[in-house]
């Protein structure tokens, strides 16, 4: 299993931002298509103080989505490549020999989102289910009002549109 270029770009950009956040610039540029296959989105991380520049260009929406989520507060998960897995397994073997206990290691590495580094606080996960429960009583109350005397106008609209076809 080899490391993908997008994973290299994400890890290098996050490390660069962790080292020197005030001098690091992120730029996203979009090249509109002259033909359908010529669409390009390029992501660039640049630090002139350390003279580092990372660039990733793609035309796939999946890659763009992954990079934008890496910029967000939750970050992304990256599977390590062959070299990193070998290094991790050597470390595990040394630990097992020393402690004579089996240690289960994760093969997936979580990368912190760049927005978390900018804010410098932990980001809490929000539950979308909590938002749905708050809106349900309002919808039920509106339905009760419509079933009572306020529904005369809505019945006229329904009867008026009864014979028409929907498009």
From Swiss-Prot:
GO BP, sorted A to Z: SRP-dependent cotranslational protein targeting to membrane; SRP-dependent cotranslational protein targeting to membrane, signal sequence recognition
Span of the signal peptide: none
Principal subcellular localisation of the protein: cytoplasm
Region described as Disordered: 123-167
GO CC terms of this entry: nucleus; signal recognition particle, endoplasmic reticulum targeting
InterPro entries in the cross-refs: SRP9-like, SRP9_dom
GO molecular function list: RNA binding
Comp. bias intervals (Basic and acidic residues): 123-139
Keyword terms of this UniProt record: Acetylation, Cytoplasm, Nucleus, Ribonucleoprotein, RNA-binding, Signal recognition particle
A Pfam family matched in the record: SRP9-21
Location of this chain's protein in the cell: Cytoplasm; Nucleus
Regions of compositional bias (Basic residues) in chain numbering: 154-167
Residues the record lists as N-acetylserine modifications: 2
Subunit and interaction comment: Fungal signal recognition particle (SRP) complex consists of a 7S RNA molecule (scR1) and at least six protein subunits: SRP72, SRP68, SRP54, SEC65, SRP21 and SRP14. At least SRP14, SRP21, SRP68 and SRP72 are proposed to get assembled together with scR1 RNA as a pre-SRP complex in the nucleolus which is exported to the cytoplasm.
Function text: Signal-recognition-particle (SRP) assembly has a crucial role in targeting secretory proteins to the rough endoplasmic reticulum (ER) membrane. SRP is required for the cotranslational protein translocation for ER import and preferentially recognizes strongly hydrophobic signal sequences. It is involved in targeting the nascent chain-ribosome (RNC) complex to the ER and is proposed to participate in the arrest of nascent chain elongation during membrane targeting.
Other observations noted: Present with 3400 molecules/cell in log phase SD medium.
Name of protein: Signal recognition particle subunit SRP21
Species the sequence originates in: Saccharomyces cerevisiae (strain ATCC 204508 / S288c) (Baker's yeast)
Gene designation per UniProt: SRP21
